[in-house]
Structures are given as C-alpha cells and as structure tokens.
Amino acid sequence: MDPKNLNRHQVPNFLNPPPPPRNQGLVDDDAASAVVSDENRKPTTEIKDFQIVVSASDKEPNKKSQNQNQLGPKRSSNKDRHTKVEGRGRRIRMPALCAARIFQLTRELGHKSDGETIQWLLQQAEPSIIAATGSGTIPASALASSAATSNHHQGGSLTAGLMISHDLDGGSSSSGRPLNWGIGGGEGVSRSSLPTGLWPNVAGFGSGVPTTGLMSEGAGYRIGFPGFDFPGVGHMSFASILGGNHNQMPGLELGLSQEGNVGVLNPQSFTQIYQQMGQAQAQAQGRVLHHMHHNHEEHQQESGEKDDSQGSGR
C-alpha cells in the first residue's frame, strides 16, 4: 500500500459544484437597491408631473385675466340703448314680391340693412301717411318717451317737420298756430276730421279708401315748412300733389299688383311748391334788407343830429 494515497475514496472535484463567488452577493444587492430606487423614483416623477400640471392650471386664469384687462371691460347688454316703443323686435310678415323688392332696393340704394330701406320708403310716403292717419311715421309712444326725457328737444318727422294746418275761419291767413304733425303727433285731430281718400284699391292690402273730396280747395288746408308759411298752397289739394287714380306708373308699385295704383308724387305740384318757397325766401330777404337799410338811415340821421348839436354848442 502506498502511504501517500491515504484518501483513496475521495470524491473527484468535478462532481462537486463550484463554490459561489464572493462578488455575486454584491451584485444581487446592487440589483435590489436599483429596483428599489426605480420604485422610489416613479412616484416622485408622478408627483412632479402632477405638481407641474397644477401649477400650469393655476397660471391659466391669470392669463385669462390679463387678456381681459388688455381687451378692456365687457360691454353691458345693449337692450335698453334704443327708444322703447311698442312692436320693437317684432317680425313683420309681408308678401314675397314686396320682400324681394325691398331687398333689391337695399342693394340699389346702398343701404346697410333692409330696415333702412323701409325707413326710406316711409320717408317718401310721409305726406300720404299724414293725410291718411293724421300723424307722421314716428310712433306716438316714441314721441312721448323722447318728450319725457328731454323737454327742450322736439323730435321732428322724417320729412323735416312737414306741417299741415286747417283754417277754421274759412281759409284766412291769420289763423291759430298750425299743428305740427311731426312733433305733436296730431293731437286733437282724429282720422274722421281729415278728408278721406288717398290710396286706391291695392291688391293684398284690402279695400281702399274712397277718394272723394280729398282735402278739397274750400277746406282751407295749408302746407308749410318750419320758417315758411305759404297760404297760396292752400288751393292745392293732396290729390293734386299725389298722382291721380288713372296715372299708371309701372315699376313703382313695389311689385304688389300690376293693376293697383299707389299714389305717386306729382312733380308739377312740387315745382309749384318750390317756386312759392323761392318767392317767400326772396320776400323774407327783401324785408330783412329793407329793415337793415332803414336802421342804417336812422343811425346816420342820429349821428348827423349829434354832430349838429355839438357844432352849435361850440
């Protein structure tokens, strides 16, 4: 027996598993700490993101307030800016041809809206409206509200204060103060007191008013403008100012009917009115010049008398 080989039955080394390395525990500890650090980092980032979102939402109202300050204060409701009248904000139904004609007139006249075109049409028909109703196109409620707000301001009608007066004494020029229909709204005068008859039958507007005796020559009506008074126009009736019933004017009927005849202003009557206005202006200017000349002569005469008295006193 070999004394050197004492451990014959020793297990070979390849059958034994190798011992674990010493650095493996350190690696596992590092991995575990890394996982823990990652888990710790995730909620911190979420919290940071949440804080950022909250801070951004806090800044948004500040930006809005700054924008509002730059744009200026908000305008209040403009519902009460205009005159309060009955029927305001009400829709008006009209025939299709009439609406189409108003739309066409708005484009032809260069108005901004159809309301301005309707206002223009009322302005053109002011004499007819006054003769038929006894008041102008401005509603009585608007006149009352404007008179209550400002006593010194008097709202005129759309035709520069067209005035009509009736001489109860039989047409004499020295009558009372003429009624201003544009300002007074025809107070004290009803429709029955005015002669009937202005508009003939027009399709779509019902039966017309009989046209007999419209402001006859003997009734003593006068027409005038503020600052002028033309008694001579009293011999002209509104029927002569407005075209007769048989004057067919195609294209001026607002497309309502080809047979209906709407009262059309007669240019010859307005020519006569303009001539009388010119004569009245000339007479007024002559009176003013005569008055000024008379005052100048009196002043010169007084100065001459003073000079004579001073010369005699010396």
Swiss-Prot record:
TCP domain: residues covered: 78-132
Keyword Cell membrane found: no
Cross-referenced InterPro entries: TF_TCP_subgr, Transcription_factor_TCP
Coiled coil spans: none
Pfam family, one: TCP
Keywords: DNA-binding, Nucleus, Transcription, Transcription regulation
GO cellular component terms listed in the entry, alphabetical order: nucleus
Record carries keyword DNA-binding: yes
Compartments it resides in: Nucleus
GO biological process, one term: anatomical structure morphogenesis
Chief localisation class: nucleus
Region of interest called Disordered, as start-end residue ranges on this chain: 1-91, 295-314
Biased composition (Basic and acidic residues): 38-49, 77-89
Annotated GO MF terms: cis-regulatory region sequence-specific DNA binding; DNA binding; DNA-binding transcription factor activity; sequence-specific DNA binding; transcription cis-regulatory region binding
Domain of life: Eukaryota
Function of the protein: Transcription factor that binds to the site II motif (3'-TGGGCC/T-5') in the promoter of PCNA-2 and to 3'-GCCCG/A-5' elements in the promoters of cyclin CYCB1-1 and ribosomal protein genes.
Subunit structure comment from the entry: Interacts with PURA1. Interacts with SPL.
Name of the molecule in the record: Transcription factor TCP20
